[in-house]
Amino acid sequence: MTISINEYSDLNNLAFGLGQDVSQDLKELVKVASIFMPDSKIHKWLIDTRLEEVVTDLNLRYELKSVITNTPISVTWKQLTGTRTKREANSLVQAVFPGQCSRLAIVDWAAKNYVSVAVAFGLLKFHRADKTFTISEIGIQAVKLYDSEELAELDKFLYERLLEYPYAAWLIRLLGNQPSKQFSKFDLGEHFGFIDELGFETAPIEIFLNGLAQAEIDGDKTAAQKIKSNFESTSDKYMRWLAGVLVTAGLATSTTKKVTHTYKNRKFELTLGTVYQITAKGLTALKEVNGKSRYPRSRKRVMWEFLATKDKEAIAKKTSRSLMLKHLTEKKNPIQAEVIATLINTDYPTLEITPEEVIDDCIGLNRIGIEILIDGDKLTLNDKLFDFEIPVQKDVVLEKSDIEKFKNQLRTELTNIDHSYLKGIDIASKKKTSNVENTEFEAISTKIFTDELGFSGKHLGGSNKPDGLLWDDDCAIILDSKAYSEGFPLTASHTDAMGRYLRQFTERKEEIKPTWWDIAPEHLDNTYFAYVSGSFSGNYKEQLQKFRQDTNHLGGALEFVKLLLLANNYKTQKMSKKEVKKSILDYNISYEEYAPLLAEIE
């Protein structure tokens, strides 16, 4: 196989790979490829009647008809996917699929997702030089089978393409490794994507179930329905579609699952939603994906566009990860992470790749379906890949942002805790965060205390509750986590809320709802508080000191990085639990072990 590097005057910002609002029946994808096949059923239908029915702009209708009567048929992104309209279609893919309710055709968002998946399955080719799309040989074969109504052969053909689709390979492996387990969309999202990167976050299942339980307590059916409809991240939506594809292909089953959930010392029977479990056919597919028994391993179809989400670091990340795959395919395996980092930095020194970053990215590549064996610092690419291209922009230097440089420095420091926590730095530095990201920052902060620092506890969140409650044999800590890119100012309104939580925890009055404190033991010797943020601003030290004096409670302000380094020091036994607590309760946030790192990038 060949992974080639080619220069372009500029790069696209298109996303290919996963889909939302796309049919879970892969035969529907063939309709997209049919647009490019002269005399196919879909092609004839578009020209003869369909475009007349759904494209109301006469000039645009003429343009779309003209483009698919040219030879060869080459179509732009806009001609394929269009823009938002009231009810009519203004693109070819919109026109192919019927709309819902009063719409004549699907919306542009759904059309973009159809194209994204059609390209990822190899049915269409994307030409970066002129940013146009044409049909591939695979697409031609699929359309011929579709038009001749050889549906059994078409299903077999698409099944083979599905096993080449790395995201499907990832999900088949995940389900197949625990064949007796039923996976919710939350479980799937938790195991998907690059570990320290925004865009792969999943909504916490605990918050989802707590919300449903509270709605039941309140007798609010509207709130419960809203939670069921809207409580999911972008990653969760992609997982739901991908799992549905496996179900349609017979590789997994789906069912609605009820769970018993404890909330406020009460047990609730709640509907978790759809869960997925592998089938016998799915276990056979696992052998084909991995090349076990008599089955040859399926070759995986990868694109540069698969290798990062659409953030400001995406181009550098896609390129560095593509280069990792290039060196893994070209050099004798196993190969050390340090060697790969050196090879990349030799050609692209401004990427400043570290061995730790290589290993973290290889974990992420596994989590999108490209299997790489990681044995310490030795890496072996187990999957065979189809040829693909690494596009680079002419005269543009790829550089990391200060945040990414800082994260790389931290990777070398965080030797004993999971690097997925580094995602918290990205969330804390964003100027505008989503509700899911804010909730995830709260959950990450709480998890560091419970999984790394030896506390018991729970992420709470929601109205009239702190973000987290932690405890051990000696004390309780009430946690407030804030992702403020300009620094958390710690105003009087924030300390007023914390003061209320401290009183509620101490008094434990059952008439006050919600009784969030019930999860912690009574009669602990001490009750503390802690604020966690990316940074703090304003006169937070004075405010914090005054609050400590007014409430007679000890507490501190921790920059998120300080929390990470405390956890690592505790796990490496450089600090005792007593020393950790002392540092948490120190209202001076400066921390000698990370101050030099901060100074290096200022």
From Swiss-Prot:
Which EC number(s) are documented for this chain? 3.1.21.4
Which InterPro entries has this protein been placed in? Answer: FokI_cleavage_dom, FokI_D1, FokI_D2, FokI_dom_1_2, Restrct_endonuc-II-like, WH-like_DNA-bd_sf, WH_DNA-bd_sf
Task: Cite the SUPFAM superfamilies for this sequence.
Answer: Restriction endonuclease-like (SSF52980), Winged helix' DNA-binding domain (SSF46785)
Keyword Nuclease set for record: yes
Give the top-rank taxon of the lineage listed in the UniProt record for this protein: Bacteria
What is the reaction catalyzed?
Endonucleolytic cleavage of DNA to give specific double-stranded fragments with terminal 5'-phosphates
What molecular function terms (GO) are annotated for this protein?
DNA binding; type II site-specific deoxyribonuclease activity
Q: Which GO terms describe its biological process?
A: DNA restriction-modification system
Q: Where, if anywhere, are coiled coils annotated?
A: none
Q: Does the UniProt entry include the keyword Nuclease?
A: yes
**Keywords on this record?**
Endonuclease, Hydrolase, Nuclease, Restriction system
This protein is called what? Type II restriction enzyme StsI
> What lineage is this protein's organism placed in?
Bacteria, Bacillati, Bacillota, Bacilli, Lactobacillales
